[in-house]
């Protein structure tokens, strides 16, 4: 049997076999769950899914030729870098979920702005009036925190609403689709501009807890805050207290602080579900009938670059994620 050069740390399914067969036809590979460590001595790369489920029993430090890990998911928070040799480079699937997360972000923005849950409750009760207090995306200003692949996809979808786009990235360098761009160290200045504030940033040592009480207080009292990035960029208690004390402020969240994917449980430290100015979804922005195929193709395309001797895209700096 051909020695494996690629280790696939994902639940076995036909879609994976199909994509790998098309994009890496000459590369030997096997699943972690079905493979034999005795055939892993030539493994150079890993396709990584869930850290909690798929890395159980894998001793990455015992793989002498492992040099690259491509994650299926966008985020790299939670990856146990200490279990890998220092030589190993990591890449997230940046842009892999962008079309789907961006669509969900706009849906959340509209649900919160138009008070759709309250409107549904009125209709279900057979009432027409008084209607919920509705806000518009049309010709308003949206601030997008994290103007990467997801941020740009959100901006593109807001174009139809004639929304003015203000961005925030690391450097403040101008980018297409933005009328104004702020550097990351001007977070408070950026959020002051927004009728809508979208957070699409990764969770890194720099972004963790960056939206605190002072940043929330800098937002407009009637702003709508949408988070489709990582919950950890926001201080949980600060958001709860701000929503409680500012009834005209609204939030729409797809990401949460206490997500247990292994058990399928979502816990809350504060009673967010009781807040009338919050709309939430269960970290489901990346689900849909065409998502898996698109995501796999993007991730494997980057692996193909690696195996062809080219520089993979979206390689991260481990120091931005590793805990001191």
Go through each PLM region and give its residues.
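Glycine-rich NAD(P)-binding loop of Rossmann-like domains
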Residues: 119-153, 321
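Conserved beta-strand positions in the Rossmann-like core of class I SAM-dependent methyltransferases
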Residues: 166
């Amino acid at each position: 049997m051909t020695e494996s050069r690629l280790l696939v740390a994902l639940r076995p399914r036909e879609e994976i076999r199909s994509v790998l067969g098309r994009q890496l036809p000459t590369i030997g590979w096997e699943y972690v769950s079905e493979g034999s460590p005795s055939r892993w001595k030539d493994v150079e790369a890993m396709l990584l899914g869930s850290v909690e489920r798929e890395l159980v029993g894998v001793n990455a430090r015992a793989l002498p030729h492992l040099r690259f890990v491509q994650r299926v998911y966008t985020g790299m928070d939670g990856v146990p870098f200490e279990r890998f040799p220092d030589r190993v480079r990591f890449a997230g699937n940046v842009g892999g979920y962008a079309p789907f997360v961006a669509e969900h972000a706009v849906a959340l923005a509209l649900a919160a702005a138009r008070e759709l849950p309250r409107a549904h409750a009125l209709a279900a009760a057979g009432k027409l009036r008084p209607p919920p207090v509705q806000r518009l995306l049309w010709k308003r200003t949206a601030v997008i925190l994290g103007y990467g692949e997801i941020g740009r996809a959100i901006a593109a979808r807001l174009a139809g609403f004639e929304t003015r786009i203000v961005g925030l990235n690391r450097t403040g360098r101008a980018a297409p689709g933005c009328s104004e761009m702020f550097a990351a160290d001007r977070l408070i200045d950026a959020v002051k501009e927004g009728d809508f504030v979208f957070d699409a940033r990764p969770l890194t040592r720099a972004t963790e807890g960056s939206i605190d009480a002072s940043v929330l207080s800098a937002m407009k009292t009637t702003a709508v805050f949408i988070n489709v990035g990582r919950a950890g960029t926001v201080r949980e208690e600060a958001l709860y207290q701000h929503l409680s004390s500012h009834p005209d402020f609204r939030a729409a969240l797809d990401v949460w602080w206490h997500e247990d994917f292994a058990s399928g449980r979502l816990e809350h430290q504060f009673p967010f579900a009781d807040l009338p100015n919050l709309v939430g979804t269960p970290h489901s922005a990346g689900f849909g009938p065409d998502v898996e195929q698109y995501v796999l193709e993007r991730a494997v395309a980057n692996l193909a670059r690696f195996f062809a001797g080219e520089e993979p895209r979206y390689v991260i700096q481990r120091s931005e994620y590793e805990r001191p």
